[in-house]
Amino acid sequence: MNLHEYQAKQLFAEFGLPVPEGYACDTPQEAFEAAGRISTAKKVVKCQVHAGGRGKAGGVELHDTKEGVKAFAQKWLGKNLVTYQTDANGQPVSKILVEEASNIANELYLGAVVDRSTRRIVFMASTEGGVEIEKVAEETPELIHKAAIDPLVGPQAYQGRELAFKLGLQGDQIKQFVKIFMGLGEMFAQYDLALLEINPLVITAEGNLLCLDGKINIDSNAMYRQPKLRQMHDASQEDAREAHAAKWELNYVALDGNVGCMVNGAGLAMGTMDIVNLHGGKPANFLDVGGGATKERVAEAFKIILSDTNVKAVLVNIFGGIVRCDMIAEGIIGAVKEVGVSVPVVVRLEGTNAELGRKVLAESGLDIIAAVSLTDAAQKVVAAAEGK
């Protein structure tokens, strides 16, 4: 689950991190009043969406007057912001962040992720702030400095000092950086984060550090024990189909093709998408129904796939390991009857009771196309999607 910038900054402030004075506003009038409470001559106004590239898309502006801030809010609230990280429809803007402008002398980067190779939280810091860290990692990896956190003792001040020295910080800036580092380390563990970024972490003209932007991603598997963060969830920023799938514990990601895919197992799902693409098709989605592919979940999966009007055919690819293929076949039959599937459905079953499953499908009387192999399934579903 992602948080908005204003929500990330609220958490930063709770842990003693320096953030600009700012207010999240729902209406143009609120934005106008917020601008009046901010003492700096210039105000920064930012559209709040779960996507990067807001500035280049016109979603971040600097204004001298309260009227300018209000006009920005009137322009964007209730509209969609399209950036290089969104699809063609963009993301809806329901809040505007109005905050004080800062005199920036230098921009740094500070972030943390769960590193699977070391099985630890790893902090990354760089002097190349304000740009995509992925680009820095690819072109100049020597400019990224790391600190791995021992889970038994947590973040240590000496690690913060080492990073500060490598960033070229001096005097009181080192103390400020260590405080930020320690606060982020505590917050990362306490709130079950998967990723956090401050980009940029700026040095102001006065020589102080300030968290100018914030990005936080929470481990969705830990949401059951994070009631406070659950309340921060903004469903409007998610694809409606993906949100519905999550309620049924289905792993669904919308794509832009015309071949719907329903598979059990993430690895098999990715392989299925690859082979569909190899045979000239374009997957419309990634959908992993998991090990418990019951009739109800299969029916919901069909509903989700078919809610995409671009889908011209559906490929169901099931490996019967934990589940029996005959049970899956019965679930598919029930789901097809319940949902009223109007596009060709290709089914490939392998594993436990696969032969029995294929027999159940053949005797169902439904227009279901059976496939004997993954290649056969891909060829048949691509042909069906093309109307052949």
Curated annotation (Swiss-Prot):
Query: Where is substrate annotated to bind?
Result: 264, 321-323
Does Amino-acid biosynthesis appear among the keywords?
Answer: no
Q: Would I find Nucleotide-binding among this entry's keywords?
A: yes
- Identify the cofactor(s): Mg(2+)
Taken from the record, one Pfam family name reads Ligase_CoA
Q: What is its EC number?
A: 6.2.1.5
Can you name this protein?
A: Succinate--CoA ligase [ADP-forming] subunit beta
Q: What is the lineage of its organism?
A: Bacteria, Pseudomonadati, Pseudomonadota, Gammaproteobacteria, Vibrionales
